[in-house]
Amino acid sequence: MRIAVIGGGPAGLYFAILMKRDFPSARVTVVERNRADDTFGFGVVFSDATLDTFQQADEPSYRAITRSFAYWDDIAIHLPARPGRDESGSVHRIGGNGFCGCSRRTLLLLLQERARGLGVELEFRREAAPEDFPDADLIVAADGINSPIRERWKAHFAPEVDLRPNRFAWMGSTRPFDAFTFFFKERPEGIFIAHCYQYEAGASTWVMETDPETFARAGLDGMGEAESARYLEDVFAEELAGHRLITNRSLWRRFPTIKCGRWVKDNVVLLGDAKATAHFSIGSGTKLAMEDAIGLHRAFLAGGSVATCLARYESGRREDVEKTQHAANVSLVWFEHVKRFWNFSATRFAFGVMTRSKAITWDNLELRAPEFVAETRRAFAEEARAAGLPADDAKPPMFQPFALRGMQLANRIVVSPMCMYSAEDGVPGDFHLAHYASRAVGGAGLIFTEMTCPAADARITPGCTGLWNDTQEAAWRRIVEFAHVHSEAKLCLQLGHAGRKGATKLMWDGIDQPLPEGGWPIISASPIPYFPHSQVPREMARADMDRVRDEFVAATLRAVRIGFDMLELHCAHGYLLASFLSPLTNIRTDEYGGTIANRLRYPLEVFRAMREVWPAGKPMSVRISATDWAEGGLSEEDCLAVARAFAEAGADLVDVSTGQTVADASPVYGRMYQLPWSDMIRNEAGIATMCVGNITTPDQVNTILAAGRADLVALARPHLTNPSFTLHAAAQYGVRDIACPPQYLWGKDALLRNAAREQADLKELRLKARPRSHAPEAQDLPRAAE
């Protein structure tokens, strides 16, 4: 086999090593445009888990690399003095992480040495293109982030480049470190961040980062390397401790997140940064590149033609790459919005740094650094106490109380509003009683009803619940009274109007599909059908607005009589009021269309009318779709304007959902995928939020709350299969005083006893499953700062 590798970085060299080792008869050539000892940047970082992977892939190169690594276990987070928050600044050292740093130049030289020893042909200071290797069976394009090969066949590889807004520059210093260190500094120009680690004796990396506004105010766009280094030496004078910054092509850049639709063209395959990048804030660029090499090598070990192996590589490797990129993207967004968290307590800020990428969570961090998690737990409880609530230092965040106006919740778990499509003529029946009652006694602090409609023609389907007559009112009262008598749960009525998404089939018969018969006329902000074959709604006239507003008010008065604890107005998911908010569904030219202020006009009118008749001591919330997941939809600025407007109108909480506005939306799903919008609204608009969306575990709930990204957490699907989700979570964390009906106490006691044993066993398994430490105690490796 003839293999040509274009690009002599870690990805290309490592692949050449693995292939020549296992296919010794193959002729493997690596061609690099730079000199053998040229490198840009300073150090690279690998975790213990990554080192495990390298050891399994190639023991000799692993041993050579680790002999040159500096190792550290802690992450240190330094915050400056912040007037009104931390007068003297703070430092958090959080252990249990296990990282190594190495000079990028040393890494390349060691990989070159290993490759030569195996018989790989290495050529430097040579530009190469695929046509230079007409007899090659395989051409590997490992030619970097600006890959000429990728750009040459751009139409085929279909790269997407997302140029992120923050500016960054790689610098170095002689200052030693014994931890991976984050320095956050505030100047009149703005906030600067330094990501620092030692990679060999007397050498450390300093990745400088700042937002575009601070970059411009500081004048860094007009400075050269030396001048910007001197400027940053002034910013980080205390942190540098007398050491100077070192430059090496330390140019200010914006990070390009690169994804490719295809990785393979004929016998050419993209590898490393040429096909996908991962942001430096999780230290995964070189890891991703070298693991690409391992994945491609394994594809060839499995046998078959070159085409078969390349297809196997792309299909088998893509998911792992996308997961790493997703974690990196979530992390980089946290740093882009660091101003959002600047007034957090030092403990909450540090917890946010640690959990920013979702790779580390509450339970995981408790294994790594139990003292820090205990501090976080105490700090969260103290915030609740400061709000006048009976908090308990021993409980995790999800079991701390929360209050909205005069309503106090026993915990922060919410049963999300979920349409059951099981009512007859809008009347909730026995199914609904069993559904809501079982979740109430299951321990959740707050239970939302499904979207309940204020009129018959406001329903999504014939099976939707309503609140427009006495029969419905009596049926809802039965449910609310049961919950109040037999549980500590509070109940929130969600009122909404389906608008253009009304008169459709039951979900299991065809979600959002129009009824073939028995439908009713529908209305919307504009006469735009949801699907091309959907019923065309009539554009609302002023008389329609008056009628619908009054129907909402009448339903609100019924909710008062029933005794609901809280009320929510549904302004999301493309339903009637949401259709006014989104520019995709509102093309009106009157005072209710156009600007966001105009688009808000009618939804706010309805909300204010409801708030006026709803008791002053009881809270109200609004559910919104914070993004439409479609081009031309609601912007972040619009979203914040919506949240602020409802807060000014008397909303106590924003229930943050996304999408379902238009049929051709392209949502990006994943764990906790709607959390960024809850975070943004809570910490920029300054209103309490409830997050929802693929949140499935108590661990995730605690992570979200402790990081200050939401105040309440709603779970839907987990409550469908486990009405006692909260009771089980209480047992998991040893919370004994969760409310439980006396009829169920024996079961609760057994659950608590069994959970204690199960959690001890689980902790032991998790500790055993952790990557083994590559610390120098076990090997002859240098410690960082030695």
Features from the language model and the residues they span:
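Conserved FAD-binding catalytic core of PHBH/FMO-like flavoproteins
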Residues: E113, D135-F255, K259-C260
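C-terminal helical "tail/cap" subdomain of flavin- and related membrane-associated enzymes
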Residues: R298-G388
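Glycine-rich FAD cofactor-binding loop and adjacent beta-loop-alpha segment at the N-terminus
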Residues: M1-A4, G8-D73, G95-T106, G285
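Glycine-rich, N-terminal phosphate-binding loop of Rossmann-like dinucleotide-binding domains
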Residues: A142-G144, A278-H279, M418, R717
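Flavin-dependent oxidoreductase catalytic cores
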Residues: A374-E786
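Conserved N-terminal helical subregion
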Residues: D48-W170, F372-E382
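Residue-level marker for buried hydrophobic side chains located in beta-strands
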Residues: T29, V268-L270, I447, V713
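Conserved mid-domain beta->alpha element of the FAD-binding
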Residues: G8-L18, V140-A141, M171, L251-V330, ...
